[in-house]
Amino acid sequence: MRPSRRAPDELRAVSLERGVVKYAEGSCMVKFGDTHVLVTATLEDRLPPWLKGQGRGWVTAEYGMLPRATLERTRREASAGKQNGRTVEIQRLIGRSLRATVDLQALGERQITVDCDVIQADGGTRTASITGAWVALADCIGWMKTRNMFKGTAPVLRDNVAAISCGIYNGTPVLDLDYAEDSEADTDANFVMTGDGRIIEVQGTAEKTPFSQDEFLALMALAKKGVARLVDLQKMAVA
């Protein structure tokens, strides 16, 4: 029995609310159970120096946690003077995941910066961030379309992107781990996938004991089911 009493293939209660920030070109409040992340997408007329003059744009991401997003206060990274390795890893993952389905040529010489701020953390902050980031990005691109900022007719967003965690808890493959499950899991993995089921990235770790190929395939099957549900929710959020 899972601590949450969910079925092995059951997501937490998920909500995606688009357009929650007044000033941002795109935004989304994403909730995976008790994990809450505020995501904004900002359009900027600037590019990394190495991209200037190439006629294409860029999508990048930043990630952070509020001090009391966790059970005990976490020191702000700004006060420490640097980001920790986990933060850098996660924000690079978010950026890579979003760029996988964006037509950067169609975007033109512009940058969209996606900020993911964790308000409350109960496991799966990176997967919630990616799922909400796509909605905020779609919101931003929709804002640009209403202002005729694209020259061609080709879609700038070629597909959805969503992410979910899976793990082996008490010998059973389960979907969408919360903190209680994640901290006790034998294995945990994060899957980032497109709307049509293609894989963008997989991160898997044996926390206690190595896992078999069959167990991995069971986790991937759960992830595909979970991502399909998340994509449905994304489509409803941006409709």
From Swiss-Prot:
Keywords: Nucleotidyltransferase, RNA-binding, rRNA processing, Transferase, tRNA processing, tRNA-binding. One of its GO terms (molecular function) is tRNA binding. SUPFAM superfamilies: Ribonuclease PH domain 2-like, Ribosomal protein S5 domain 2-like. It is an enzyme of class 2 (transferase). InterPro entries: ExoRNase_PH_dom1, ExoRNase_PH_dom2, ExoRNase_PH_dom2_sf, PNPase/RNase_PH_dom_sf, Ribosomal_Su5_D2-typ_SF, RNase_PH, RNase_PH_bac-type, RNase_PH_CS. CDD domains: RNase_PH_bact. The keyword tRNA-binding applies. GO terms for biological process: rRNA catabolic process; rRNA processing; tRNA processing. Phosphate binds at R86, G124, T125, R126. The keyword Nucleotidyltransferase applies. Its EC number is 2.7.7.56. It catalyses: tRNA(n+1) + phosphate = tRNA(n) + a ribonucleoside 5'-diphosphate. Homohexameric ring arranged as a trimer of dimers. Belongs to the RNase PH family. Phosphorolytic 3'-5' exoribonuclease that plays an important role in tRNA 3'-end maturation. Removes nucleotide residues following the 3'-CCA terminus of tRNAs; can also add nucleotides to the ends of RNA molecules by using nucleoside diphosphates as substrates, but this may not be physiologically important. Probably plays a role in initiation of 16S rRNA degradation (leading to ribosome degradation) during starvation. This is Ribonuclease PH. The gene is rph.
